[in-house]
Amino acid sequence: DDDRPGRLDGSYVAGKFGNWIFSLGQQERWWGSGWEGSLILSNNARPVPTFSIDRAVSEPFETKWLNWIGPWRLTTFVGQMEGSRDDYDHPLFWGMRVSARPLDGLEISLERTAQLCGEGRSCTWDDFWNMFSGNDNAGENVDPEDEPGNQLASWDIRWASPIGDWNYA
């Protein structure tokens, strides 16, 4: 508990540019196909204040080489977490989710989140690139104490049955 008179949870301000939505706010996110649980992001914890970029309308690529992916969606965000932590105060929290519907009723998604930077840790574009590309994983020429962040990755598949009103996740 704290002495704050109010919270901004669930609020945001957004603008649209082409097929992209840019927003600032504290939006709850539920990443995963399950209705009762999510492996990577859920509304179990309070939302982090973030800057987000989302694809507004899910449409297939126009090129014949990528059209088979079907309608696709991308969302990414970055925000700064709170201080007074046991690890590093004020780390950045980054996430990205890409989903596609190659067939009617079938959705495939890939998700990734990472905590990086924070007080007392390096925070450069190289650090972000090493995290994004997987070059910073412990055991990959990086000692655990030098690993610049904590990462999670997930994938999920959701299929809506053409018979009845059944969904499988």
PLM features: what roles do these ranges have?
Residues 30, 50-169:
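Signature for the C-terminal beta-barrel architecture of outer-membrane proteins
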Residues 7-8, 32-39, 80-83:
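Short acidic, glycine/Ser/Thr-rich loop/turn "cap" segments at secondary-structure junctions
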Residues 2-5, 9, 42-49, 146-153:
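Phosphate/oxyanion-binding active-site loops and adjacent basic polyanion-contact surfaces
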Residues 22, 27-50:
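Aromatic-lined, polymer-binding surfaces characteristic
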Residues 1-26, 52-55:
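Beta-barrel outer-membrane channel/assembly domains of diderm bacteria
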Residues 5, 39-40, 90-95:
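Short secondary-structure boundary/capping segments
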